[in-house]
Amino acid sequence: MATASADLKIRRRLGRSELMVTPIGLGCWQFSKGRGLFGNYWTVLDDGEIQRILGLAINGGINWFDTAEAYGKGESEKALSKGLQNLGKSPGEVVIATKWNPVLRRSSSISGTIDTRLQNLAPFPIDLHQIHNPFSLSSVKSQVRAMAGLVHEKKIRYVGISNFSRGQMERARQELQKSGLPLVSNQVRYSLLDRRIEANGVLEAAKDLGISIIAYSPLAQGILTGKFHDDPQLIKSRSGF
């Protein structure tokens, strides 16, 4: 039987991109340092603990990391970059994904915020830039056009989405096709406790269209590991519960 470390030597193509990633990536919401609307959902981590987590991920074979503008108002991006540099990683050695926060904003803020994203993550480039959710004041068409513009300006490599329905995903893909670009991924909640994408058409459409599903909370934020059953006191340490 293959071991977990052996499995992480595998590289899978992300959608119809040239990005080759391990089957498991590391989500970096927990690097928010208590900032932002949901920054206190997690226990606040210091730089040393963040670097330890990143080191464990890298030593285990993980080669890609997912962060977002909304994670601590950019603190997660900064912490990720700092930690990777301290661990001796250079641009090109890891794959970086981040997300634009669309809530109550128009698509014009995609180009208006990209330089901050790049500054926070420097020297690492943005391999995948995602629309975090479908709650922008602008249409999907307008948002995707703005994202395509960033690709053509070489500020990002590829475009993804997150929390999009089947219809929204299909519209985003169609609009990107007009610019000659693929829609690489749709990042959605997916675990043994939440299998909605199997019934609502998202998973089926993604397979048909060559769009990778990036599953977030695949262990239901630790519930499926059994650790809360083994030690109920851990629940009290989670401010998000």
Residue ranges and their predicted role:
Residues 14, 26, 50, 57, ...:
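Conserved, mostly hydrophobic/aromatic
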